[in-house]
Each structure stands twice: as structure tokens, then as C-alpha cells.
């Protein structure tokens, strides 16, 4: 189709020439007639059909036959590429592997090649593995032609014989020795086009009509740089005899000479030994075995020969011949042929990238094919295959990758042979005959690849020796090729070596397995401990330590233990990723959980305000999650963007082993962890003096110190002290770091707790913590010493603040009381709660060691029995004191005593006042009611006074000492002076609202040298509070005596006599009973407010 298309295109381009051709009566004036063009296209179509049958149909039949034979014999052995170079292939653009069968183009090769191919087919059929060789046996060169491996090997033998003068009778009997491999004709495309043009001219003009035209055309062809000889023959169409010929050759000095050949004689046929000529009678279409097949998709007017050696010219030549058809039936048939010297080309048997000849579009197509097949080509081509360069322009591409080096262990290196290069037979290369030494078999050196070595031939193996050794192995003469001429593999891990010395560091597997077993056991023990903690999470020793944070700590420790699993095997990318994640994520989880608990203690310990800092587990988890999220995002980004890989490092013996790479991701994370450790150390330093339940804060601080110290120490060991340590030493350092940091943390945090549980003290509170008054704020879970049901912390805080305020008010109240009692240096405040009635200070102790507590109420005219309740309408009740008081009452018949406690309240009447006591005989049961009233008084005031005095004297030891000294001085002064006071006692027996008569006695002077102060009180029953006691203001005007003068009502209360063997300070403390009320509110009691019991 392409031929017909070209014909149509030429007709359109030259309509004038076609018209001239029609009027010339069949003569051709330089333009082919349509009839000739049609004949040419028909002949080309026949040639293409025949080519397809010989190159594709027949090989397909052979392929099916080989498959059937292979499946029938069931071969199991496989011959490797190293021992069978025939199994190699090249897959560049001109070496594309085809799927045609192992067969020759029956008419394209010499008669001797068919038996060789048949024997090769029989050889391959017996082995299934060698079936692949049939696919690799046929290769394609740059211009599209195909060639078999057998043809290549036979051509190499021919080249070797010629190069080593092993010619025999070649140049005597046979002047030409052709090869069986085609040459890439694209390099001589310009020469071919010139020859086609000359053939077209001769065809149009005619050979005999112009005698000088043939000489002119032959000489013109010699102007081409590549053409060294041109010949034009005029042959008889009937018998094929030579009618005339011209043969011009280019001399050594570039002069043109006529060449006379004995094989060409007028009237005789040309000799059949000429490789550039074939008779049309034997080969009508000139598809002779002497000619190489034309490249596909290309139309040539003539045929290229195989390269051949010319003994007469002593050079390697290739010819292009064109048969010129006759003009008529009885005309002459022309024949034109040119010779191109290819002696300057070289036989390069190594892998090389072919030079892309042809047009620009063809070069681009070849480059695209080269890029597309690059991955597959790298499996077969040597390591020296590089980019397309100018050094391959002179290579015979058919011989590429035909070397005999072992493919897996050797690489071919082309060496240009010199004239002095010796051969195996002891001779030298033929340079006088060939004029060049580039046409030599074995012009290469087999060098050991990286990872292989040869002790006998460290510089490589000579290519000629490798060719002979391979041929001997093929002929079963010797096995030196596979046993002697080979490279041995280096020890594992060696890129290059010169011997069998090891390159990888040795791994002591029993030692590593023992450390791994311990680490896995610790990880399993951590999970068991987590289950034990979950089961006993309600035990107080675990509950106060936040079980959720303890569980998180155990999870982090288990992850840190698993790092030993990640660094156990030979490291690669997967294990390096696992190493980074287990190391840093485990550290972050463990360290953060411990730090959060310590931070809670730090914040509570440093607080200076009265506000409660509420830090429960949920809040700490909310602070912990962002820290873990930052680490998670960092490790994820690291893994995706710059995946950690295993890099090779050297130990002190220069042995290699793999270690995970360290880059700026590691350095940045290390800096962040250092700052994190520094913050943890700062927090632990702040709580160094803080007290906590079970001493947990201090143990966690020790654990954090230990983690920081161990990590810093291990960095120093790895980087500074042992930078070239071997893999076992590094694994041991990792084990030590894991055990010192993780196991020690578990022992410090969980060891004391588990020990207490085993001792049966898990549910018992820490007694030392109780003694140190450890509150809930200093507990690591924010609860402290609490029952099972935790109360509201805010309510607890408010109650504590209220108690503190009440105690402060009581202390201030007692200070005022003790300052004003019997202190003559202070002027009493009018209307105060305690008022001294006499300006003369009375001694607290009389001569008979009886002290009198004097109390006087202020005067309040509006004080009535109906206003005897507290302002809030509640009755203020006292609390029973731990230190009870006993009360004695002197009645009319004698002394009535209530002995319930160690301290007594004695109500004595002075001797001078006994006569003024109102008779109570008319009221039955007065003594019992009086005793009940006094008991109520004791229960109200005694406990408050006792607790307040104890607290006051504890806080004011110096003031208490001075107070006792003042009392001693006043007592001595009272011994020298005496005074009398009038005392009146009235008893009101009627509870009814109407006025009841009260019998009053006149005051009688007391015989005692000392008199007590007055405590004014009225004993009046009331409906709400029968037999109640009402403390009235001073100078209270009785409603019974409203018309008379105000009468002062007193009641003397005398405390019991202190023991004589006690010191004065102790006596002073024991004689004090509380007179204050422990009310529900925290306000200071007003002195004028009545208290109802």
C-alpha cells in the first residue's frame, strides 16, 4: 500500500514529466512510466508477502511445535543466565524481544544455518526452562531487521578466524567471506539514496545509448564519503552474460582508479562468488540468501548485502545492489552496485545503547521506545549501560550483548584491542590484512559486579578467554567456564569486596532473644497489673491515687516495653516506624499522666487565696488530651512526609549494620522532650515539701527525676561515649534504658500500694497523713481522707470557712472577757456584757481560796419577760463539754450537790447574807427546780468556756503568763484591803403574768474581808421556758416594785476550790468555765442581748 501511495504522490508532483513520458513512444526520459511503477509495486507486494511467510508464518508454526514438545517431555531443570549466555536478550529499540519461534528464515540464511537451527530447536525442546530461550533467540536491530543468536555466534567465529590469521585456504579458494548478521543500514542512508537516483537515471536513459554515462555515474558515486567502490554492469537479458561494465574504486590517497576483476569478463556471466551479485535466473526477485532482508516499513530499490571480508582489498565491506529492469523485451538488463568500507566499525559485544540513526521523527520514536522499555531493559543490560552517546555510532549493533560474561556476577567492559594484543594461539591480531583491529571477537573485559569478587583474577577476565571457555563448555570439553572463570559473591551486606571477609556486624541472637523475652514478660506483667488495679480500684490506696491515671500510666509503660520488639530484628522502614511510635508515644503517655497528678498537687500547694481550686480527674484529662494530640499529629506528619528509613552505619570494626535514620525530625522532637522534662522537673521541685496521702507525690517526683536522668544519660551514651557501638551493645543500651525508666517508674508508683494491699492495709488511711493534717486538696486525686461517697467539695470549703470565722470570733470574745474580768485598770464599758460594779478591784481568790465570778448585766428598761428569745427567735443552746463541771447549791436546809463531772460550780451564800434569804418553805420542790436550772446553766456555758480557754491559751502563751502574774499581784493587794457589797436575792415563784409579791431582805454586812461582785439575775418562770434563767441588765427595775426604787438583784456564783497541790497557772486554767455560747451563726454576741436556755 505504501508503494502505491508513493506512486500516486509522485504522479501529482510531476504532471509535466508524466505528460512528456506519454509522448515519447515508450522511451523513458528520466521519469518512470505508469506501467513500470505498477510493476515495481507489484514486485514489492510479492516481496512483502514472501517476507511475511518466511519471517512470521513459519516461526509461528515452529512455536506451536516447540510448545507441544515441551509439555510432552515435562522438563524440570533450568539453565541460568550465568551458565547459558544464549538465554540472554536485549530489549532496546533495536533489540526488541519478539515472540517468533526458534527458526531461521529458511531462505534468508545460508544453507548451513538450517541444520544448526534444527539442532538448537531439538536441544531446547528437552527443557521447559529453555523454552524461554526460543523467544530470546531472535533479536531486532535498529533498522528493524531481525537476527538469530546462532547467526551471531557463527559470525563471531568468522571474525575471530580472520583476526587471528586462521584463514586456511580462504583467500586462495574463496575471495570473500560473508557474515550472517545484517548491518544497520540507516547510517548509510545518503549513499543508498544516491545509488537509487543513479539507477533511476540509467533506467530512464538506458545503459547502451550513452556509453560515457555509466562512467560518469560511477565516478559521481565515489564522491560520497562512505562509498569506496562503484560498478555498473550491462547484462544480456537472455543468457545473463556481461556486455559491458565499469568498476571504479577509491584509492588510499582518495584518487579514483579503474578496477579490473578477473571474475568479470565480457561475454561470460559474473562469478557466483561475488557477495554483491546474484543472477536473476536463479533469483527472479533478487531475494537471494546473499542479501539481507530489507527493513520493514521501508522501500528500497535494491538490496543490502551482509558484511563480508574482501581478501583482494583486505577490508570489511558491505554492498548495495540494484537490478535495473530492461526497457524492452530484447534489451539489456542493468546492474549497479556500490561498496562501503565498514572496517572502521567495531565489534562491541558489551551492552550499549544504540545510536539512533535516521530522521528526526525516527529518532524521537526510538527514544520513546527506549524510555518505555527502560525498566525491562535494566533486567538484562549491564550496569555500564548509559545514555545514548557518540561512542556507539561506530558499533555493529547486531553484536551488542553477545559477550560471554556471567550476567549475574559480571559486567562487560569494552576494550579496544591493539595490534600487539596476543591471542590464545600465541599469535597476534591481523592488522596488515584487515587494516584495523576493531573487528575482533572478545574485545572486552569481564569485571566482577559490585558484591562479587575473584581471588585469581581481581582485575577481571579477558574476553577472548571467556569466549573460548564458553565454546568448550558448549562442546562438553571442559567446565572451566562455570567453575573457574566466575566471580564469587561477597559476604552478605558487602557492596564491594576483594575476598570472603564479612561486612555485616554479627548479631548475638541468644543474647538478644533473652533481653526480648524479659521485655515481653514485663509488658505482659504490666497488663496483668492493670487488671489487678481494675479489680481493686475501690480500695482506698488506689482510689485516692486516681485509678484512671494509674491505668493510663500502665498503658504508656507497656508501649515503652514494646520498643524492644521493634528494634529486635534487622531494621527496615516498617520497623523504624514502629520504633519511633512506641518510643515517643509511650514516653508521652507515661510522663504526661504522672506529670498531671503532680501538677495538681503543685497548683494546690502554691495557692494563696481562700478560694478552692477544683481539679478533678476529668479536668486533668482535658488538659492531658491536647498534649497527646500534639504528639500524635507530629508522629503522623513525620511518618507521612518523611518516612523513617534504616540507614547503614559502621561499628568500631568497620562492620556494617542498619539503624533507623536520625534527621531534623528526631532533633526537633528531642528538643521538645527536653523542655517537657524540664517543666516536669520544675513541677516536682515545687512540690518537694508538699505532703500527700501515702507519700505518693514524692514517689512520683522520684519517678519523673528518674525518667529525665535516664533519657539524658542514654543520649550521652549513644552519641558521645559509644557512637560506634555494635548492634548488640545498642540493643542492650535500649534494654537498660527501658528497664531503668519504665520498670523503676512502675516500682515507685505501684510498689508501695500493692505492698499495702498485700499487708491488708489497703483500706486503711495513712495515719501519718492524718497526723500531718493532709486535706483533700493535697491528695493526688483531689479527694483526700473521705468515705466511700465523696461529698461536695465546695460545701466542704464553705463549712471550713465558717468554722474558721466562728473560732476567730470566739478567740476575740475570750480575749475581751479575760481582759475585763477583775481588771481594775480597765474602765468597764457601760451597758457591756460584763460590767464591774465596784471601782475597787477584787481579788479573784479570797483567803479561803474561793474565787467569785461576777457578772452584771446592763440596764435595759425595755427588757420584759416576753422579749427573752434570741433575735432570730431560736433558743441558743449550749453543747455538752468534754470537760464537765460539777455544781453545788446551798439551799436553806443545806448544800445540794450535782456531781456529774470533774469541775464543780459552787453557789455559796455569804454568812452575812444567809439571814436575808427568802424562805422557800411555801414552794415545794424548790431545791430540785434550782438544781435543774443550774444544770442547764452548766450545759450551756461550761463547754464553750472550756474549749475557748484551751484554744486561747494555746495561741497566746505569753499573754496567759502575764495574765496569771497580774492575778497574783492583785491577790496580794486584796489581802491588805477589804470591801463590802450589798447583795439581795429574790426568788419569784409565781409563773402567772400578774404581779407576784416578792419578799426582800435588807442587806446585811458581810463579815468576810472580801466580797464578790454582783451577778444580777431574776429567776422567773414563764410559759415558754419554765424554771428558766434570765440574765437581766444591771439595776433592773422589777415590775413588782415599779413604784419604788430600783432594787439590785444578785446571785453569787462561786467556783469550786482548786486543788492546793497545783501551780497557780494550772489553778487559773482549771477554774475557768466557758460563759460564751456556741451559736449556729458566726456573729459576735451583743452584750445587751438576752440568752434564753
From Swiss-Prot:
<keyword id="KW-0597">Phosphoprotein</keyword>
<feature type="topological domain" description="Extracellular">
    <location>
        <begin position="569"/>
        <end position="584"/>
    </location>
</feature>
<feature type="glycosylation site" description="N-linked (GlcNAc...) asparagine">
    <location>
        <position position="94"/>
    </location>
</feature>
<feature type="topological domain" description="Extracellular">
    <location>
        <begin position="641"/>
        <end position="660"/>
    </location>
</feature>
<keyword id="KW-0472">Membrane</keyword>
<feature type="transmembrane region" description="Helical; Name=6">
    <location>
        <begin position="702"/>
        <end position="722"/>
    </location>
</feature>
<feature type="transmembrane region" description="Helical; Name=4">
    <location>
        <begin position="620"/>
        <end position="640"/>
    </location>
</feature>
<keyword id="KW-1003">Cell membrane</keyword>
<feature type="transmembrane region" description="Helical; Name=3">
    <location>
        <begin position="585"/>
        <end position="607"/>
    </location>
</feature>
<feature type="glycosylation site" description="N-linked (GlcNAc...) asparagine">
    <location>
        <position position="462"/>
    </location>
</feature>
<feature type="glycosylation site" description="N-linked (GlcNAc...) asparagine">
    <location>
        <position position="476"/>
    </location>
</feature>
<feature type="transmembrane region" description="Helical; Name=2">
    <location>
        <begin position="548"/>
        <end position="568"/>
    </location>
</feature>
<feature type="topological domain" description="Cytoplasmic">
    <location>
        <begin position="534"/>
        <end position="547"/>
    </location>
</feature>
<keyword id="KW-0807">Transducer</keyword>
<dbReference type="InterPro" id="IPR017978">
    <property type="entry name" value="GPCR_3_C"/>
</dbReference>
<feature type="topological domain" description="Extracellular">
    <location>
        <begin position="723"/>
        <end position="730"/>
    </location>
</feature>
<keyword id="KW-0325">Glycoprotein</keyword>
<feature type="topological domain" description="Cytoplasmic">
    <location>
        <begin position="752"/>
        <end position="1093"/>
    </location>
</feature>
<feature type="topological domain" description="Cytoplasmic">
    <location>
        <begin position="1"/>
        <end position="51"/>
    </location>
</feature>
<feature type="region of interest" description="Disordered">
    <location>
        <begin position="12"/>
        <end position="35"/>
    </location>
</feature>
<feature type="topological domain" description="Cytoplasmic">
    <location>
        <begin position="682"/>
        <end position="701"/>
    </location>
</feature>
<feature type="transmembrane region" description="Helical; Name=1">
    <location>
        <begin position="513"/>
        <end position="533"/>
    </location>
</feature>
<dbReference type="GO" id="GO:0004930">
    <property type="term" value="F:G protein-coupled receptor activity"/>
</dbReference>
<feature type="modified residue" description="Phosphoserine">
    <location>
        <position position="519"/>
    </location>
</feature>
<feature type="region of interest" description="Disordered">
    <location>
        <begin position="849"/>
        <end position="881"/>
    </location>
</feature>
<keyword id="KW-0297">G-protein coupled receptor</keyword>
<protein>
    <recommendedName>
        <fullName>Probable G-protein coupled receptor CG31760</fullName>
    </recommendedName>
</protein>
<feature type="transmembrane region" description="Helical; Name=5">
    <location>
        <begin position="661"/>
        <end position="681"/>
    </location>
</feature>
<keyword id="KW-1133">Transmembrane helix</keyword>
<keyword id="KW-0812">Transmembrane</keyword>
<dbReference type="GO" id="GO:0005886">
    <property type="term" value="C:plasma membrane"/>
</dbReference>
<feature type="transmembrane region" description="Helical; Name=7">
    <location>
        <begin position="731"/>
        <end position="751"/>
    </location>
</feature>
<comment type="similarity">
    <text>Belongs to the G-protein coupled receptor 3 family.</text>
</comment>
<feature type="glycosylation site" description="N-linked (GlcNAc...) asparagine">
    <location>
        <position position="236"/>
    </location>
</feature>
<feature type="topological domain" description="Extracellular">
    <location>
        <begin position="73"/>
        <end position="512"/>
    </location>
</feature>
<feature type="compositionally biased region" description="Polar residues">
    <location>
        <begin position="849"/>
        <end position="867"/>
    </location>
</feature>
<dbReference type="InterPro" id="IPR043458">
    <property type="entry name" value="GPR158/179"/>
</dbReference>
<feature type="transmembrane region" description="Helical">
    <location>
        <begin position="52"/>
        <end position="72"/>
    </location>
</feature>
<feature type="topological domain" description="Cytoplasmic">
    <location>
        <begin position="608"/>
        <end position="619"/>
    </location>
</feature>
<dbReference type="Pfam" id="PF00003">
    <property type="entry name" value="7tm_3"/>
</dbReference>
<keyword id="KW-0675">Receptor</keyword>
Amino acid at each position: 500500500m505504501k508503494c502505491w501511495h508513493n506512486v500516486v504522490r509522485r504522479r501529482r508532483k510531476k504532471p509535466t514529466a508524466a505528460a512528456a513520458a506519454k509522448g515519447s513512444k515508450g522511451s523513458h526520459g528520466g521519469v518512470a512510466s505508469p506501467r513500470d511503477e505498477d510493476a515495481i509495486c507489484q514486485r514489492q507486494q510479492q516481496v512483502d508477502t514472501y517476507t511475511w511467510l518466511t519471517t512470521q508464518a513459519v516461526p509461528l508454526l515452529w512455536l506451536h511445535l516447540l510448545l507441544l514438545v515441551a509439555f510432552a517431555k515435562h522438563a524440570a531443570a533450568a539453565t541460568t543466565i550465568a551458565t547459558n549466555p544464549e538465554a540472554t536478550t536485549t530489549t532496546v529499540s533495536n533489540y526488541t524481544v519478539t515472540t517468533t519461534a526458534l527458526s531461521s528464515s529458511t531462505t534468508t540464511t545460508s544453507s548451513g544455518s538450517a541444520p544448526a537451527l534444527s539442532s538448537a530447536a531439538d536441544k531446547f525442546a528437552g527443557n521447559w526452562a529453555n523454552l524461554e530461550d526460543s523467544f530470546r533467540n531472535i533479536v531486532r536491530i535498529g533498522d528493524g531487521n531481525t537476527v538469530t543468536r546462532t547467526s551471531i555466534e557463527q559470525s563471531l567465529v568468522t571474525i575471530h578466524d580472520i583476526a587471528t590469521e586462521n584463514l586456511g585456504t580462504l583467500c586462495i579458494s574463496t575471495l570473500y567471506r560473508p557474515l550472517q548478521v545484517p548491518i544497520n543500514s540507516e547510517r548509510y542512508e545518503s549513499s543508498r539514496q544516491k545509488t537509487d537516483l543513479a539507477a533511476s537515471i540509467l533506467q530512464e536513459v538506458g545503459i547502451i545509448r550513452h556509453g560515457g554515462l555509466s562512467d560518469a555515474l560511477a565516478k559521481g558515486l565515489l564522491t560520497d564519503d562512505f562509498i569506496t567502490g562503484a560498478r555498473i554492469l550491462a547484462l544480456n537479458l537472455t543468457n545473463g552474460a556481461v556486455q559491458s561494465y565499469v568498476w571504479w574504486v577509491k584509492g588510499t590517497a582518495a584518487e579514483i582508479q579503474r578496477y579490473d576483476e578477473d571474475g568479470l569478463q565480457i561475454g561470460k556471466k559474473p562469478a557466483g562468488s561475488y557477495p554483491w551479485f546474484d543472477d536473476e535466473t536463479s533469483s527472479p526477485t533478487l531475494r537471494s540468501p546473499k542479501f539481507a532482508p530489507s527493513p520493514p516499513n521501508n522501500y528500497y530499490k535494491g538490496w543490502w548485502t551482509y558484511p563480508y571480508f574482501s581478501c583482494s582489498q583486505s577490508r570489511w565491506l558491505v554492498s548495495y545492489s540494484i537490478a535495473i529492469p530492461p526497457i524492452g523485451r530484447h534489451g539489456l538488463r542493468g546492474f549497479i552496485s556500490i561498496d562501503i568500507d565498514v572496517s572502521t566499525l567495531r565489534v562491541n559485544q558489551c551492552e550499549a545503547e544504540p545510536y539512533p540513526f535516521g530522521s528526526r521523527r525516527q529518532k524521537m520514536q526510538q527514544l520513546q521506545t527506549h524510555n518505555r522499555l527502560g525498566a525491562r531493559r535494566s533486567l538484562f543490560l549491564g550496569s555500564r549501560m548509559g545514555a545514548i552517546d557518540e561512542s556507539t555510532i561506530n558499533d555493529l549493533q547486531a553484536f551488542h550483548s553477545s559477550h560471554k560474561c556471567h550476567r549475574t556476577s559480571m559486567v562487560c567492559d569494552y576494550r579496544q584491542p591493539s595490534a600487539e594484543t596476543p591471542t590464545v594461539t600465541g599469535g597476534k591480531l591481523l592488522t596488515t590484512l584487515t587494516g584495523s583491529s576493531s573487528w575482533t571477537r572478545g574485545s572486552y573485559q569481564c569485571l566482577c559486579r559490585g558484591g562479587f569478587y575473584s581471588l585469581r583474577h581481581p582485575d577481571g577476565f579477558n574476553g577472548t578467554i571467556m569466549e573460548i571457555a564458553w565454546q568448550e563448555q558448549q562442546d562438553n570439553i571442559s567446565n572451566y567456564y562455570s567453575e573457574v572463570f566466575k566471580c564469587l559473591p561477597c559476604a552478605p551486606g558487602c557492596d564491594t569486596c576483594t575476598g570472603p571477609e564479612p561486612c555485616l556486624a554479627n548479631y548475638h541472637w541468644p543474647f538478644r532473644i533473652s533481653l526480648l523475652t524479659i521485655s515481653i514478660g514485663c509488658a505482659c506483667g504490666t497488663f496483668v497489673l492493670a487488671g489487678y488495679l481494675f479489680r481493686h480500684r475501690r480500695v482506698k490506696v488506689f482510689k485516692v491515687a486516681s485509678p484512671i491515671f494509674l491505668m493510663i500510666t500502665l498503658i504508656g509503660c507497656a508501649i515503652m516495653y514494646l520498643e524492644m520488639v521493634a528494634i529486635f530484628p534487622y531494621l527496615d522502614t516498617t520497623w523504624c516506624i514502629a520504633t519511633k511510635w512506641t518510643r515517643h508515644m509511650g514516653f508521652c503517655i507515661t510522663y504526661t499522666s504522672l506529670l498531671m497528678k503532680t501538677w495538681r498537687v503543685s497548683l494546690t500547694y502554691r495557692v494563696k487565696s481562700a478560694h478552692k481550686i477544683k481539679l478533678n480527674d476529668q479536668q486533668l484529662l482535658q488538659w492531658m488530651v491536647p498534649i497527646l494530640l500534639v504528639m500524635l499529629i507530629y508522629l503522623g506528619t513525620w511518618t507521612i512526609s518523611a518516612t523513617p528509613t534504616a540507614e547503614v552505619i559502621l561499628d568500631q570494626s568497620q562492620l556494617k549494620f542498619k539503624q533507623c535514620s536520625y534527621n531534623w525530625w528526631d532533633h526537633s522532637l528531642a528538643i521538645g522532650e527536653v523542655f517537657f522534662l524540664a517543666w516536669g522537673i520544675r513541677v516536682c521541685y515545687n512540690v518537694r515539701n508538699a505532703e500527700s496521702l501515702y507519700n505518693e507525690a514524692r514517689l512520683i517526683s522520684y519517678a519523673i527525676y528518674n525518667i529525665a536522668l535516664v533519657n539524658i544519660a542514654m543520649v550521652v551514651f549513644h552519641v558521645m561515649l559509644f557512637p560506634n557501638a555494635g548492634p548488640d551493645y545498642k540493643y542492650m543500651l535500649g534494654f537498660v534504658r527501658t528497664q531503668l525508666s519504665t520498670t523503676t517508674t512502675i516500682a515507685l508508683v505501684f510498689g508501695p500500694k500493692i505492698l499495702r494491699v498485700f499487708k491488708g492495709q489497703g483500706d486503711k488511711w495513712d495515719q501519718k497523713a492524718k497526723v500531718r493534717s493532709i486535706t483533700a486538696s493535697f491528695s493526688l486525686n483531689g479527694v483526700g481522707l473521705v468515705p466511700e461517697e465523696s461529698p461536695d467539695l465546695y460545701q466542704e470549703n464553705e463549712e471550713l470557712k465558717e468554722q474558721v470565722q466562728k473560732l476567730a470570733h470566739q478567740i476575740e470574745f475570750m480575749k475581751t472577757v479575760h481582759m475585763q474580768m477583775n481588771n481594775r485598770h480597765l474602765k468597764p464599758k457601760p451597758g457591756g456584757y460584763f460590767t464591774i460594779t465596784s471601782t475597787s478591784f477584787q481579788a479573784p481568790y479570797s483567803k479561803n481560796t474561793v474565787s467569785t465570778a461576777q457578772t452584771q448585766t446592763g440596764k435595759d428598761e425595755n427588757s420584759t419577760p416576753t422579749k427573752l428569745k434570741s433575735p432570730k427567735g431560736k433558743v441558743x443552746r449550749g453543747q455538752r463539754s468534754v470537760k464537765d463541771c460539777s455544781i453545788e447549791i446551798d439551799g436553806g436546809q443545806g448544800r445540794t450537790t450535782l456531781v456529774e463531772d470533774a469541775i464543780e460550780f459552787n453557789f455559796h451564800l455569804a454568812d452575812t447574807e444567809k439571814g436575808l434569804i427568802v424562805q422557800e418553805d411555801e414552794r415545794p420542790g424548790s431545791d430540785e427546780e434550782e438544781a435543774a436550772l443550774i444544770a442547764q446553766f452548766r450545759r450551756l456555758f461550761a463547754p464553750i468556756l472550756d474549749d475557748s480557754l484551751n484554744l486561747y491559751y494555746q495561741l497566746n502563751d505569753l499573754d496567759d503568763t502575764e495574765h496569771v502574774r497580774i492575778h497574783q499581784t492583785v491577790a496580794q493587794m486584796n489581802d491588805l484591803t477589804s470591801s463590802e457589797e450589798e447583795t439581795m436575792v429574790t426568788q419569784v415563784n409565781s409563773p402567772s403574768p400578774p404581779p407576784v409579791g416578792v419578799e426582800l431582805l435588807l442587806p446585811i454586812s458581810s463579815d468576810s474581808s472580801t466580797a464578790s461582785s454582783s451577778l444580777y439575775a431574776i429567776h422567773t418562770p414563764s410559759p415558754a421556758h419554765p424554771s428558766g434563767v434570765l440574765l437581766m441588765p444591771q439595776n433592773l427595775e422589777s415590775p413588782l416594785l415599779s413604784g419604788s426604787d430600783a432594787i439590785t438583784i444578785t446571785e453569787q456564783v462561786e467556783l469550786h476550790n482548786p486543788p492546793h497541790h497545783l501551780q497557780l497557772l494550772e489553778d487559773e486554767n482549771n477554774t475557768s468555765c466557758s460563759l460564751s455560747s456556741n451559736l449556729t451563726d458566726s456573729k459576735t454576741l451583743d452584750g445587751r442581748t438576752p440568752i434564753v436556755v
